[in-house]
Amino acid sequence: MNTARELAQLANELLRCRETPDYPLALNGLQVDNRAPVTRIAAAVDCSQRTIRGAIDAGANLLVVHHGLFWGGLQSLTGAHLDRVRALLEHDVALYSAHLPLDAHETFGNSALLARELGLTPAGGFARYQTIFCGVQGTADLETTSLVTACDAFARRHGGQAIASAIDPGRRTRRWAVVTGAGINSDTMREAVDCGLDTIVTGEGPHWSAVDAAEKGL
């Protein structure tokens, strides 16, 4: 059986963690080690007391997350932060985190996998950040409402729901982009217009983005 360090090294190489830029002080890789060989792996978006407890209850001793414990440099071990670390250590659960390396990977990345889950075929990158693309884009020819329905069905399988800006009757999606997480800002909106996109699927967007999107043909 592999140790958490061995599995982390494999994941780091696969996701190209060392070469992939990320937000300042984001810590990608093995954040908390353990003692025993890894026998079961759990995965979640966030490292929270709930997801840690879920991993423990499932008998996992490696938790893989997108949003790890450490973001802003030095952090004191107090409050909820201490509770999370204590639970990992007391139950010998290792923690591995991959942020932008997991968003940006062209095969295993969040954006690429979500696009394929929705029946879309990525043909290039979108949402440029330094030397990488956090999202994907491509072409299609389908009713926008059918894409929203597919998004909603996917979201509901995971306890959520899809929210769409105003859609005119008969509107079709021909040039799309998928960027997971908080993928909409002034830069990505401008990039979408420059690329001639008509539809963007994202994890979350601010209120103003729905207003701007309608005025920009998105």
Question: What do these predicted ranges mean?
Answer:
Residues 1-218:
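Hydrophobic structural segments
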